[in-house]
């Protein structure tokens, strides 16, 4: 019990030091992910890998004919269903992202990516996401990462997705493998979802 208390207090002080304030509530899903739409088949998907156990239950959200959402960093799990609902109401990916981010007091700590059924993509990386953090948005896809070993992770993901062969699932997995090969999550790997 003493060890737990010591670790807990240390984490509180670390968060206060790193963020200058208490981090917003939300699961600590520091990770890398990709959202994408295949321009030929129209398939959409989202894939994620992290040190965080059961990462797919928080980060990945998708609905056929609607879109795909990845919510991560100090994740706001409501972004998944709310993002899909906004897409269903004929909002573009960018409009949905703008509405979600504007209404969230914890936006500076969040990372969010959305692709809609037309292939429009929108991505947000808050300025207080744990480094290394960033994203690349390409034609009908976005890759995003935070708490990474280095800043080569998301460029490696984008390159692997663009140059990948096979169906959408193959290219999503290629992006995850490229991220891991480039250094991946600074804590290691324990969980993935597609």
What does each model-identified segment do?
Residues 5-17:
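Bacterial N-terminal signal peptides
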């Amino acid at each position: 019990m003493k060890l737990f208390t010591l670790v807990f207090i240390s984490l509180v002080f670390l968060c206060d030091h790193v963020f200058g304030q208490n981090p917003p509530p939300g699961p600590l899903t520091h990770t890398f992910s990709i959202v994408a739409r295949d321009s030929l088949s129209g398939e959409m998907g989202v894939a994620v890998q992290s040190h965080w156990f059961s990462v797919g239950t928080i980060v990945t959200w998708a609905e056929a004919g609607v879109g795909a959402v990845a919510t991560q960093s100090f994740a706001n799990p409501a972004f998944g269903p709310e993002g899909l609902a906004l897409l269903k109401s004929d909002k573009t990916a960018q409009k949905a992202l703008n509405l979600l981010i504007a209404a969230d007091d914890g936006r500076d700590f969040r990372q969010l990516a959305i692709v809609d059924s037309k292939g429009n993509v929108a991505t947000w990386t808050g300025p207080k996401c744990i480094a290394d953090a960033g994203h690349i948005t390409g034609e009908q896809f976005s890759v995003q990462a935070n708490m990474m070993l280095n800043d080569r992770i998301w460029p490696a993901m984008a390159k692997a997705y663009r140059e990948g062969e096979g169906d959408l699932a193959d290219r999503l997995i290629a992006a995850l493998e490229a991220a891991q090969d480039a250094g991946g999550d600074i804590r290691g790997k324990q969980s993935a979802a597609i």
